[in-house]
């Protein structure tokens, strides 16, 4: 049995208290608690506490400490239930305490995976223009249930997906001006897959791109690569030269007809 002999406010935090006790051998420092625990257990000078009660006090103090760590972690941005659990595990908090903290956070509505998934979907689609496949994968990695994700993705209709994909195409295609039209389409296709768009949305967007095919830019790209390969292979003669040129330009996405026209032009220049 111990008797509380003194309670003092900590210098660095007005919400934490040092508790001094006497176990029969004079006053000594016992433990420190948060204000919430002080009030919850009715700690005051002269109160007698046994070992069982002391254990309860210290356990609840650990729960409160972990709870405040979680609140601080949440102050930067919303988190999922799993993210909070992972964070506390890294802080070496025991599973029993983690479960209590998470239950309290859920009760106090500091964490709500449904709300998180909806807001995350809106942000990633509107700001970062990610496709639904990537958004779903990221939410799964954050521990959000599949059913909740399916519901949140209803916030991202196909029309919006197409709008975003076309924006990404318009932004990216400028960097592919020296590529053939076919090669540019392949690279844009790969980019949209990485961004998380479905095959259906990608095909719709690339069909619109087909209508914008710029013959002048296609010729510029053909001449750019053709002249580069011409310098590389001109040391070869006849069939070997033409075969290497055709293979190289075909791999770049140019049609056989386009390649033949270019080679004919080079013959006429010689």
Swiss-Prot record:
Location in the cell: Cytoplasm
A Gene Ontology biological process annotation?
regulation of DNA repair
- In which domain of life is the source organism classified? Bacteria
Cellular component aspect of the GO annotation: cytoplasm
Q: Which Gene3D superfamilies match?
A: Winged helix-like DNA-binding domain superfamily/Winged helix DNA-binding domain
List keywords of the entry alphabetically.
Cytoplasm
Annotated InterPro entries = RecX_HTH_1st, RecX_HTH_2nd, RecX_HTH_3rd, Regulatory_RecX, WH-like_DNA-bd_sf
What family does this belong to?
Belongs to the RecX family.
Function, please? Modulates RecA activity.
Protein name as catalogued: Regulatory protein RecX
